[in-house]
């Protein structure tokens, strides 16, 4: 007879871990106990040596589906120390300090789906059905350990039948904290109306069927929903939400419905129908003009559509119910918020912000503690490439194997905000918060930071934030009453890529995005940095240009285009002639802009790669203005991709005009990538009538060549052979592939993002990593 004390670390709460341990104990024929300690699960296993060994093998090889075991510690203990165990028991949770791992929310499992649509089951059509394998976790959690009384389900006492299942080791709901049924669980209802339960769901389905718009409360917040096959309904939602062109996310009935509209490979299907169920950006199928399905206005001008499957029971009931209403196979399911505001999470917010955008509000009385917008995932070379990391993924920690000790908070960026809490080598990125230009989002950030600090039981020693003095994220960090460390935006991008790839040594960082406050007070965004966790050096950039017109220039790429053309010609008349030839803007608009350039009025020096893409899109006549962030740049990418599909070889630009053979030098002697010469070439070829798609492709290829050549020259100086690619521009998969392949041909080792976004949704990780190193160095 032996006794072992076992501690299991990882995602072991809210995933049915203790019931699974109990079943393994029974199968192996051992006695003992299992207790949730908060940071870990503690097990005592007592029995014959072969039985205990069998139990440990089962524990390691057959964990619950949703668990993530990071490590298992075992030690022998004496029987007299803990006594003899007569059976195997699940002991009430105890609170213990240590490493903490919180489970994200888990999509409805197959077993619960079957029960929900079984007329003989007592949870038939129950909108909140769940078990140990699925259901809300992070979004209902007040504190750890994960038990019902520390969740928003504490307001719903279990009925005798649910309590019986909860206490029975033989059931799937043994120790399932959110367990409930139609008799004792939360209830759906229409706000401001009498319909509740069944009547509310039927009214919602009828409204959507008839072309209406409904706000629907899910797991992490509200969605705005309408029939995605109804052009009139989608256009009305666009008008109400003031969203003329930005793609809407779609929820499909099932995998087969997705395959009707999109090309889906095995990897994508597995993720699409997995337990996280993010929005996947999938390529649209080519369809005939008279085919039915998704209407064009869902994702206009985009070769892809963002699509997901139902992950909450109430969402499944929208598609299938016993009321005889035939619902479409596709629903628009876009975030329930007004422009710039965070996703609504309660009735008060929904009524105030969404009432004018919808015909009904379907809510429920289970409180959402933490907002969690949908995650968005693209694919690159067959692998996941995260665009927005939120529901289903947050707050799973990123592990970095640096010998760091301490606790830090990073406030993240101003746009696409997420924050990050670092504890030693573990970094917990929050769900998506949003754009902090809106004070409601700032408030949401502050609330979520406080809740995460409580949940993870941390007291940060340092707050990290962006270098920009006027960012609201900077203000939030400064108001925490902690020492503040400010990190340059693009340096944080590169550190986030290093941390995700667990790179400890120096890299050449290629940080390409829309904007970031530089150490010299100008706008950066097309940078080559030499970086490690101690600091960075700006080694190069794209050619600086005047960004005229302030914030509006980010939406009107033609302004940057005029500035770039003028920078090349240095002649007003010649510039106006070119602008007229390519129909870039009116003559009066051009004159005003040139005058502003001469006087440096409302103009700032910039090396923004994002604005460069916008300008090229305008020059080529693809998009002169953007109605949403990245619209012009995306259109340029799509045009280049369309050309690549048609033609495999292109003509080289004449006389090497766009080549990077002669880099310019700024006063500080940094390498300058000759993007100005590339603009000159593209403008000339456009006036000659060369196909815009071809020129878009040439732009991508030549920019990739400039980046590769710049990295090669930096390597010659520094001997650094690792390159990290980060920043929102690298969501452009064509540029990413061209740069990566170009660097690999030069025998560089290339680091890129995978499950941490390359955009500003990932920079909090880089900020936190720097702050952790800052603590180690005792700065």
What do these predicted regions represent?
Residues 259-264, 317, 343-348, 374-375, ...:
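Conserved phosphate-binding catalytic cores of ATP/NTP-utilizing and phosphoryl-transfer enzymes
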Residues 1-178, 182, 189:
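Intrinsically disordered, low-complexity, mixed-charge
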Residues 215, 457-469, 718-729:
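Short glycine-rich phosphate-binding loop at a beta-alpha junction
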Residues 491-512, 516-518, 557-566, 701, ...:
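Glycine-rich phosphate-binding/hydrolytic loop that grips phosphoryl groups
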Residues 466, 481-493, 721-724, 733, ...:
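Conserved phosphate-binding/catalytic loops in two-lobed NTP-binding clefts
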Residues 62, 165, 323, 327-402, ...:
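Internal gly/pro-rich beta-alpha loop/helix module
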Residues 178, 185-187, 413-451, 563-720, ...:
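A contiguous, well-structured pocket-lining segment that forms one wall/lid of small-molecule binding clefts
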Residues 76, 159, 221-286:
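A phosphate-binding glycine/aspartate-rich beta-alpha loop in the early core of alpha/beta enzymes
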């Amino acid at each position: 007879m032996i006794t072992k004390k076992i501690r299991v670390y990882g995602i072991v709460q809210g995933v049915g871990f203790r019931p699974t341990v109990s079943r393994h104990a029974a199968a192996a024929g051992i006695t003992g106990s299992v207790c949730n300690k908060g940071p870990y699960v503690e097990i005592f296993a007592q029995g014959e040596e072969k039985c205990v060994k069998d139990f440990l093998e089962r524990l390691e090889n057959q964990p619950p589906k949703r668990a993530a075991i990071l490590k298992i510690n075992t030690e022998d203990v004496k029987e007299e120390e803990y006594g003899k165990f007569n059976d195997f028991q699940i002991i009430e949770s105890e609170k213990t300090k240590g490493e903490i791992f919180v489970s994200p929310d888990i999509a409805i499992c197959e077993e619960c789906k079957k029960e929900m649509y079984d007329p003989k089951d007592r949870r038939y059509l129950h909108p909140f059905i769940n078990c140990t394998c699925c259901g809300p976790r992070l979004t209902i959690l007040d504190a750890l350990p994960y038990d019902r009384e520390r969740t928003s389900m504490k307001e719903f006492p279990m009925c005798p039948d649910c309590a019986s299942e909860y206490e029975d080791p033989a059931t799937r709901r043994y120790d399932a904290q959110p367990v409930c049924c139609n008799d004792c669980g939360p209830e759906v209802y229409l706000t401001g109306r009498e319909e509740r339960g069944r009547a509310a769901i039927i009214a919602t389905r009828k409204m959507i069927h008839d072309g209406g718009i409904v706000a629907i409360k899910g797991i992490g917040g509200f969605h705005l929903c309408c029939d995605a096959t109804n052009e009139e309904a989608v256009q009305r939602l666009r008008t109400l939400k003031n969203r003329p062109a930005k793609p809407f996310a779609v929820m499909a009935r099932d995998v087969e419905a997705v395959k009707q509209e999109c090309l889906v490979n095995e990897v994508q299907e597995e993720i699409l129908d997995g337990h996280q169920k993010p929005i996947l950006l999938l390529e649209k199928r080519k369809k005939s003009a008279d085919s039915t399905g998704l209407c064009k206005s869902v994702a206009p001008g985009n070769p892809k559509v963002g699509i997901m499957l139902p992950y909450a029971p109430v969402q499944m009931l929208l598609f299938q119910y016993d009321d005889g209403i035939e619902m479409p196979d596709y629903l628009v399911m876009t975030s329930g918020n007004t422009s710039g505001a965070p996703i609504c999470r309660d009735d008060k917010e929904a009524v105030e912000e969404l009432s004018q955008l919808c015909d009904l509000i379907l809510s429920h009385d289970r409180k959402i503690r933490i907002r969690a917008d949908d995650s968005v995932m693209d694919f690159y070379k067959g692998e996941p490439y995260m665009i927005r990391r939120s529901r289903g993924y947050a707050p799973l920690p990123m592990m970095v194997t640096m010998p760091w000790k301490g606790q830090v908070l990073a406030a993240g960026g101003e746009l696409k905000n997420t924050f990050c809490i670092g504890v030693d080598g573990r970094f917990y990125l929050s769900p998506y918060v949003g754009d902090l230009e809106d004070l409601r989002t700032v408030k949401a950030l502050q609330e979520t930071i406080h809740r995460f600090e409580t949940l993870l039981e941390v007291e940060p020693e340092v707050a990290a934030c962006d270098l920009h003095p006027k960012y609201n994220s900077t203000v939030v960090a400064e108001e925490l009453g902690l020492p503040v460390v400010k990190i340059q935006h693009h340096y944080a991008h590169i550190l986030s890529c290093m941390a995700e790839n667990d790179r400890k040594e120096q890299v050449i960082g290629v940080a390409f995005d829309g904007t970031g406050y530089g150490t010299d007070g100008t706008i950066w965004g097309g940078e080559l940095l030499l970086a490690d966790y101690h600091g960075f050096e700006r080694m190069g950039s794209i050619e600086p240009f005047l960004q005229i017109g302030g914030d509006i220039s980010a939406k009107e790429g033609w302004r940057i285009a005029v500035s770039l053309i003028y920078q090349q010609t240095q002649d007003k008349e010649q510039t106006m002639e070119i602008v007229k030839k390519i129909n870039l803007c009116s003559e009066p608009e051009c004159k005003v802009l040139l005058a502003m350039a001469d006087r440096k009025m409302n103009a700032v020096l910039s090396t923004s790669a994002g604005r460069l893409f916008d300008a090229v899109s305008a020059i080529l006549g693809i998009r002169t203005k953007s109605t949403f962030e990245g619209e012009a740049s995306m259109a340029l990418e799509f045009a280049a991709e369309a050309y690549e599909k048609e033609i495999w070889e292109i003509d080289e630009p004449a006389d090497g005009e766009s080549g990077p053979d002669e880099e310019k030098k700024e006063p500080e002697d940094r390498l300058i990538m000759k993007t100005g010469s590339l603009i000159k070439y593209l403008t000339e070829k456009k006036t000659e009538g060369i196909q815009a798609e071809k020129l878009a492709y040439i732009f991508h290829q030549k920019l990739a060549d400039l980046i590769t050549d710049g990295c090669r020259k930096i390597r010659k100086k520094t001997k650094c052979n690792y390159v990290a690619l980060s920043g929102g521009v690298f969501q452009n998969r064509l540029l990413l592939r061209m740069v990566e392949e170009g660097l690999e041909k030069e025998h560089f080792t290339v680091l890129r993002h995978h499950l941490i976004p390359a955009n500003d949704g990932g920079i909090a990780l880089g900020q936190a990593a720097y702050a952790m190193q800052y603590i180690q160095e005792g700065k």
